Structure formats: structure tokens, C-alpha cells
A protein has these predicted regions:
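Fungal secretory targeting signals
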Residues: 1-20, 324
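N-terminal, motif-rich segments that launch catalysis or mediate targeting to/interaction with membranes
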Residues: 16-121, 130-239, 243, 248-257, ...
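Glycine-rich, acidic and aromatic/proline-enriched surface loops and short helix-turn segments
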Residues: 126
Length: 324
């Protein structure tokens, strides 16, 4: 499913000219080369690929990679515990770790490297969306709400798609690129300038599980403070537009800015370390081995209630179950 949010995130990482990115140029050029996509719709192609792939027979295995079901108790308590919340089928955190390793593995084919890169581009966006880091009501998919006059809606879809679309004014790639430029300006010289360095302060490609857990925890905390600070019932008493929308849209923009900035930084770290370069195969194998050892899957626990509910959605995030 194409969403402007995903393309904005990719746009943040791909647009040139923002000094806040430093050495971004070589990473994005290398990434685009690996993806073998020079079309004008490059951003949309990359942003939507993982969602499209999970809906295919070949890609069904990847459905759990788009979320981690934090078994917490919002709005009173929000927290992510990798060992508790990531199942043996995987989750966004384990997938980010795995595909970081694969992008870095010089032994893989160009096609396999491109696939890993496309997963990373998408999943670093998913992990910044608070409801992709929450188990309650299948990440908000089963929280029925009204948004902008549409009564047959759900909270997850609003955060994934309809709140961003309302802000952007549409769902075209041009809209997404325009929004990305605005957010880049905020990072480069505006309200995010003093914050941006903290978003990547602990990013470490050699310990991707810890990095991704920190990102998921950061977003999950917002479930308690922003997404549903007064509980589920408070969201179902009237239209979420405009009052709720006006309260949460600054956070939506902040999270998208974080995702794009982290993605750019993550790709830079991979490529500037020369991990993925084919002519450094020996060095790559050493680094890949170290990264793989640091990223085991959590133990196979018995499925809890939230995970069983997720299985009823076919194992996916449920994002495409409700469409206007």
C-alpha cells in the first residue's frame, strides 16, 4: 500500500542539499545504484515495495517484520521489551538487524542486497510509527474511530495514512517530496536543528537490535503521552478532526523527520564503513560475523493473547484491512 508518509521518509534520506546530512551523498547514490532504479518514481517504488511484497505468497513470511507488539498497558504504562515482545517469527527489530547484516554482506548477490536495502528503507519508517510498536487492539486496528466525517475508520489507519494525508493535502509523490523538503528545512535550520543529533546518538550498525529497540521504545512511549493519553474510550466520543488532529500532527511530523534522518544516518554508517563494497570481501565477512553474533532472535515463547490476535490478521500489521 503506497502512503505519502513512507515516501516522505525516503525523500528525507534521498534529497540532496541539506547540510545536516553531511556525507549523505555517497550513501544515497550507492543505494540507488544497488536498487537499479533511476525512474522518476524511485521514491514511491522503494517506499511501497515492502508492503506490496508482504501481500504475496513469496513475501508472506515478512508480514511480522512491520511491527513489534509491545505487551504493555497504555495509557498507564508504555514500554518495549525485545525478549518479551518479538516472537520467533520475527518483528521489526529483528528484521532491521537481519537486513542491516545482509546489506553489509559482500557475499550476497546484487538482487539480494537490493531486497535487503528496500526492507531497511521501509522498516526504519515503520518503527517510528507509535502504533507499529504497540499490541493493544492489534496496534490500534481494532479501535474504531471517526476521522474527518468518516465513521467506519480505525486508529491505526489514521496514523498510518489519513492524518499524514490531511497534513500533506494529497497522496501524490509530489506532495510527499514537498513535505520532505519542509521537514529537511526544519532539520537544517529550523525547530529540529537542536534535536537531530540526539535522534542518531546511539545508532550502531554493529548492534542493530539495541539501536532499533531504542527507536521502537521512543515511538512506543508516545502511545501513552500522545496517541491515547486518556485511553481508548476518549477517542471514540466524537470526530478526531480537528481537535485530536491538531494535537497529534506535530508528533506525526516529528516522527517522520526522525525516521528520515535515522535512515540517512544508517545508510551512511553502512556505506562509509565500506561494509557493503564488493572489493572488501574479507573485511565484510569479519564485520558481518560480528553483527550476526550480536543479533540473535528472542527465545520462542508461547504466543500471548495479543500475538494470537495478530495471527488472526494473517500475521501482518493489519494496515490494509481498512481502506476508505
Amino acid at each position: 500500500m503506497y502512503t505519502p508518509t513512507a515516501s516522505v521518509l525516503v525523500g528525507l534520506a534521498a534529497l540532496k542539499g541539506a547540510s545536516a546530512w553531511g556525507t549523505l551523498g555517497h550513501a544515497t547514490v550507492a543505494a540507488k545504484s544497488v536498487l537499479s532504479d533511476t525512474s522518476t518514481s524511485y521514491l514511491a517504488n522503494v517506499a511501497s515495495w515492502a508492503d506490496t511484497y508482504r501481500s504475496t505468497a513469496a513475501g508472506k513470511f515478512s508480514a511480522p517484520y512491520h511491527f513489534i507488539d509491545a505487551n504493555d498497558s497504555p495509557p498507564s504504562s508504555c514500554n518495549v521489551n525485545y525478549a518479551r515482545d518479538c516472537t520467533s517469527s520475527g518483528c521489526s527489530i529483528s528484521a532491521i538487524s537481519n537486513y542491516t547484516q545482509r546489506v553489509a554482506d559482500a557475499r550476497l548477490s546484487t538482487a539480494s542486497t537490493a531486497e535487503a536495502l528496500k526492507f531497511l528503507v521501509h522498516l526504519l519508517g515503520d518503527v517510528t510509527q507509535p502504533l507499529h510498536d504497540e499490541a493493544l487492539e492489534v496496534g490500534g486496528n481494532d479501535i474504531k474511530v471517526t476521522f474527518d466525517g468518516y465513521a467506519n475508520d480505525n486508529l491505526h489507519s489514521d496514523w498510518d495514512t489519513y492524518i499524514p494525508e490531511k497534513k500533506v493535502g494529497g497522496d501524490s509523490l509530489t506532495d510527499a517530496q514537498s513535505w520532505a523538503k519542509t521537514l529537511i528545512a526544519s532539520i537544517d535550520s529550523g525547530s529540529y536543528k537542536s534535536l537531530a543529533s540526539s535522534w542518531v546518538a546511539k545508532s550502531n550498525i554493529n548492534d542493530a537490535v539495541t539501536s532499533a529497540t531504542a527507536w521502537a521504545s521512543d515511538a512506543n512511549a508516545l502511545v501513552c503521552t500522545v496517541v491515547m493519553p486518556n485511553g481508548v474510550a476518549a477517542l471514540q466520543t466524537g470526530d478526531l478532526y480537528p481537535t485530536y488532529y491538531n494535537k497529534v500532527i506535530p508528533t506525526v511530523e516529528l516522527q517522520i523527520a526522525k525516521g528520515g534522518y535515522r535512515l540517512a544516518d544508517w545508510l551512511n554508517k553502512i556505506y562509509s564503513a565500506n561494509i557493503a563494497k564488493r572489493d572488501l570481501e574479507g573485511q565484510s565477512e569479519e564485520l558481518v560475523s560480528r553483527m550476526a553474533m550480536a543479533a540473535p532472535l528472542p527465545p520462542a515463547n508461547r504466543p500471548n493473547k495479543a500475538q494470537l490476535a495478530r495471527e488472526a490478521y494473517g500475521g501482518g500489521c493489519g494496515c490494509d484491512k481498512h481502506k476508505k
